[in-house]
């Protein structure tokens, strides 16, 4: 069984017991979170779609760690002016482990 859920405007696909990397969410490491915005549930026998979300369903997950993503370099350059500016950016990410999908 797997589900498609939405957190902070982004949709993710998850199975029970899997680890999902998503944009940073607030919370301490080891704390339990409950996700109620489930858009679709896929089981062996049936498929359930929400309009837009499924009522009385939830995903229970724990926060494993907060990490930084891969560094992205941004370069500004002007020709013939001897100007070059390089900046970098790292996205903040959170790994969560899906414990249970309740429907």
From Swiss-Prot:
Tree of life domain: Bacteria
Any Pfam family: Ribosomal_L21p
GO BP field: translation
GO cellular component, one term: cytoplasm
GO molecular-function terms, A-Z: rRNA binding; structural constituent of ribosome
Keyword Kinase set for record: no
Record keywords, A-Z: Ribonucleoprotein, Ribosomal protein, RNA-binding, rRNA-binding
Family: Belongs to the bacterial ribosomal protein bL21 family.
Subunit structure: Part of the 50S ribosomal subunit. Contacts protein L20.
Name of the protein described by the UniProt record: Large ribosomal subunit protein bL21
Organism, scientific name: Wigglesworthia glossinidia brevipalpis
Name of the gene encoding the protein in the UniProt record: rplU
